[in-house]
A protein has these predicted regions:
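Short amphipathic alpha-helix in the helical subdomain of ABC transporter nucleotide-binding domains
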Residues: 1, 5-9, 58
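Short helix-coil transition/hinge motifs at the ends and kinks of transmembrane helices
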Residues: 1-2, 21-24, 68
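Short, basic/glycine-rich phosphate-binding loops at helix/coil junctions
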Residues: 8-19, 69-75
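Short, acidic loop-to-helix structural element flanking the phosphoryl-transfer center
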Residues: 18-49, 59
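Asp-based, Mg2+/Mn2+-dependent phosphohydrolase catalytic module
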Residues: 38, 55, 60-153
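Conserved phosphate-coupling serine/threonine residues in phosphotransfer and NTP-handling enzymes
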Residues: 51-53
């Protein structure tokens, strides 16, 4: 039962990566992301990624978007099965970059991620509004800005 579930979960993710590769017009970083990353690097502001994605997907994104230009892939946190919650992942991410969570900015795109960021102690949450829920996001604790693209930062 569990083995079958793992098999189909991995298969689903393989299909996801395949469809991403095939949809070239839509498969790209959010507008302004590269300039934003460049700016963070230039100002020596530490940052990383903490994602619920599995390692295979993280590796795929690092390779596809050349994220290693900005982020050491070894510092990226992903779902390796050891995190009981996204809160723990945020706590580890803050340790990886050496910045206490209350001093971090977390960029999120889901309500559960926003709630976890708040519960982890972050009070500077920026939301990428890919779901057209701006008004809902603006009401959530810790949300300081809702953006459509990184050009809005």
């Amino acid at each position: 039962e569990e083995e079958t579930q793992i098999y189909y979960s991995k298969l689903k993710e393989e299909y996801y990566r395949k469809f991403c590769r095939e949809d070239e017009p839509s498969f790209h970083l959010v507008a302004g992301a590269e300039d934003f990353f460049d700016s963070l690097k230039e100002k020596k502001i530490p940052f990383t990624i903490a994602s619920a994605s599995i390692k295979e997907n993280i590796d795929f994104f690092v390779e596809s978007f050349h994220l290693d230009k900005w982020i050491d892939p070894e510092t990226i946190l992903y779902d390796d099965g050891t995190y009981a919650s996204k809160i723990e992942m945020f706590e580890d991410a803050s340790q990886v970059i050496g910045v206490p969570l209350p001093d971090c900015a977390i960029i999120e795109d889901s309500i559960s991620g926003i709630q976890s960021a708040w519960q982890s102690g972050c009070r500077n949450i920026i939301v990428v509004d890919s779901a057209n829920k701006r008004q809902e996001y603006e009401q959530l604790p810790g949300v300081v800005k809702v953006i459509n693209t990184f050009e809005d930062l």
